């Protein structure tokens, strides 16, 4: 009998690196079939909150809203000099950006409201 395990990950290079060997049958997993669910991180966050996957990538921000998931000892993708990064056109400091946001004259693109990038942005702008 084959045990099926759904594994959610993004198409990003760091996730692809972690799952390459399994996805390309470079590793034998006797009795286990991995169902790869490849989605953007915001969709994976929502799937985790709804308990739709056995194993998944999830933002630190979204993790607090999940049930029945444990953080694994490996697989994290977070560190110094590695996103999120805020860039702007022109010479703007954080106070300028905050004022423009409050006035509705500024837009900041984020990968999702449950992402760690969004949480860090909100903390940085306070």
Kindly label every feature range from the protein language model.
Residues 1-77, 107:
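N-terminal hydrophobic or amphipathic helices and topogenic motifs
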Residues 4-24, 84-126:
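Bilobed "Venus flytrap"/periplasmic-binding protein-like clamshell domains
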Residues 76-77, 81-85:
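Polyanion/phosphate-binding surface patch
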């Amino acid at each position: 009998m084959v045990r099926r395990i759904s594994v959610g990950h993004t198409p990003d290079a760091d996730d692809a690196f972690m799952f390459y060997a399994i996805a390309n049958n470079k590793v034998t997993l006797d009795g286990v079939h991995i169902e790869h669910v490849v989605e953007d991180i915001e969709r994976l966050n929502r799937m985790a909150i709804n308990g739709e996957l056995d194993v998944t990538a999830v933002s630190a921000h979204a993790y607090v809203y999940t049930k029945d998931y444990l953080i694994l000892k490996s697989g994290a993708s977070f560190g110094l000099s590695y996103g999120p990064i805020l860039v702007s056109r022109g010479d703007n400091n954080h106070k300028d950006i905050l004022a423009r946001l409050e006035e509705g004259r500024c837009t900041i693109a984020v990968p999702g409201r449950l992402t760690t990038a969004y949480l860090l942005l909100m903390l940085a702008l306070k």
